[in-house]
């Protein structure tokens, strides 16, 4: 079942066709990657796959909120057949763990890890939530304010509710907020050499 689950993810190639107007705001080098409609009369159509490389760039750059919403929903609800598989995998893992004398599959897997028990992990998550909530709230407020200012400056988006930050809005306005602060990911990456970063991650997760 796990093989079927993973194979469906690898083979998944669904997506959406958008006209160029719907993709207004997309960088040309990103737009050039998208497949074009074969029929001559439809050459203004581009195909955005539900995979991360395509969906993230549409969510991050497309000015049209309807475009971002369609991309978000399509990507979020891809592979519906995997839902039942995942439920069955979780069910069987739990049953196997119980047969081995563990309370759950999580308890079985954690026995050889640094975090020995589910209770330890839960406590850690709660501490992280408390520590990060204020910062996360402030960042969300900043993104919401960026949406308001953007809508005020762009009168063609009059149908948008400036007081609502939808899930498909976050990447777009977060990008604008970072650009306002002149955050360049390429410059940030200079502080994280590949070899050192990979070794640190492996040590953390081992």
Features from the language model and the residues they span:
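Active-site-proximal, well-structured secondary-structure segments within enzyme catalytic domains
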Residues: 3-51, 59-60, 87, 92, ...
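Short, charge-rich amphipathic alpha-helices with coiled-coil/heptad character
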Residues: 58-74, 112
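Catalytic nucleotidyl-transfer cores of nucleotide-processing enzymes
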Residues: 67-68, 72-82, 86-89
């Amino acid at each position: 079942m796990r093989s079927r689950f993973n194979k469906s993810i690898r083979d998944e190639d669904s997506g959406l066709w958008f006209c160029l107007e719907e993709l207004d705001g997309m960088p040309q080098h990103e737009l050039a990657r998208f497949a074009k409609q074969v029929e001559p009369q439809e050459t203004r159509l581009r195909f955005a796959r539900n995979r991360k490389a395509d969906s993230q760039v549409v969510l991050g750059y497309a000015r049209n909120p309807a475009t971002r919403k369609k991309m978000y929903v399509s990507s979020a609800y891809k592979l519906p057949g995997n839902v039942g598989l995942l439920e069955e995998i979780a069910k069987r893992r739990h049953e196997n763990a119980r047969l081995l004398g563990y309370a759950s599959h999580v308890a079985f897997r954690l026995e050889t890890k640094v975090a020995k028990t589910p209770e330890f992990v839960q406590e850690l998550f709660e501490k992280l939530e408390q520590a990060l909530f204020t910062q996360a709230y402030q960042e969300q407020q900043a993104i919401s304010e960026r949406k308001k200012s953007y809508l005020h400056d762009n009168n063609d988006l009059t149908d948008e509710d400036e007081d609502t930050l939808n899930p498909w809005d976050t990447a777009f306005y977060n990008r604008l907020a970072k650009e306002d602060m002149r955050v360049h990911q390429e410059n940030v990456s200079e502080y994280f050499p590949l070899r050192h970063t990979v070794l640190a991650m492996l040590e953390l997760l081992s």
